Amino acid sequence: MPTVWQLLFLLLVVAIVYVYALRFAQRFLQQDALARQHAAAAPLMHFAFQRARAVDCALNRLPCVTSQQCRDNCVIASAASDLTCDNGFCSATNILADAQAPGSAIECDPALGLLRVYAAGGDFVVSQTCVSTYRDLVDDTGAARPYLCDAGALRLELDTTPFSADACTCAAGYDKLMFRQTALARTVPVCIPTHAASLYRRVYG
């Protein structure tokens, strides 16, 4: 027959096991509830990129969403490599592919704000190209931006005269309005059809 002390010891052991089991069950339920809350609040998709910069994107197809992710995660094999996100994968292209050789004749019109620059690649290949100093008005090829005086005549002499709205003369049937993007951006003239000018004046000055 068990004694009273043996029964008390057995009850104490059962009580200790019960308390520990109850605490474990409560902790498990709390962790499960927190995991469900985090899963409900998390976005459906999450793109994680390592910043080890150990992937050669010229040989491996690394998934991407923006070109900045490629610049952060790809190995820059050459100073003449340009890393871009093309169709969802990082690709390394030669930025000097369209450049002219140093000995060839290349014209960079200073009236359009173009400067001749020389680029040296990682293989000591030197090429020259034109770079626009008025990138909001003219691209590197000397072509005016499509929104700049697109239905009129544009006269640019940026090497001698600062740019102004007077450089644009709109064609007949068009009104010249001013496009102000932000306080820090340049105001550019745009040509709007006369029949729609009253509507566009709510956006353009």
Curated annotation (Swiss-Prot):
Task: Cite the Pfam families for this sequence.
Answer: PIF3
Among InterPro entries, the record links this protein to:
PIF3
Q: What name is this protein filed under?
A: Uncharacterized 22.1 kDa protein
